[in-house]
């Protein structure tokens, strides 16, 4: 290693370790928010990948996932499992969007235990797209398709569609993602 390579290797190792060393970091600054988002994604991704791996070991296919597995989202923090399951089905197992969406929506369920706005997690969309670009792409597509369906059902009712949208005013609304997924 040259000094530059060694320093970079140590920085990468420290970045990887911090994910599990600091639980619930302060999120009153960008670094804390990025760490918290990274932690949430790390835990969701590991969980969904484990579920998929176990399912594949038993059944060897994923088209029957909703018949054998139920993933219940009990808070807004793990709502990233919706786009993460989509990512795995599309990117790793070559499902079409429609096939992946059908499997995802039949596998996921969500219970909300509060209606207090401050308890319904949101993320700054630019921070989100910086940290999780592929997940952001998937959420944008989910949102676009959902808003089109909402427009078809409630033509001209922008207020209603805006209230239900995942992406709004530069924010990613996790409860809306969980409900739609």
What are these regions (language model features)?
Residues 1-181:
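A conserved ligand/cofactor-binding region detector
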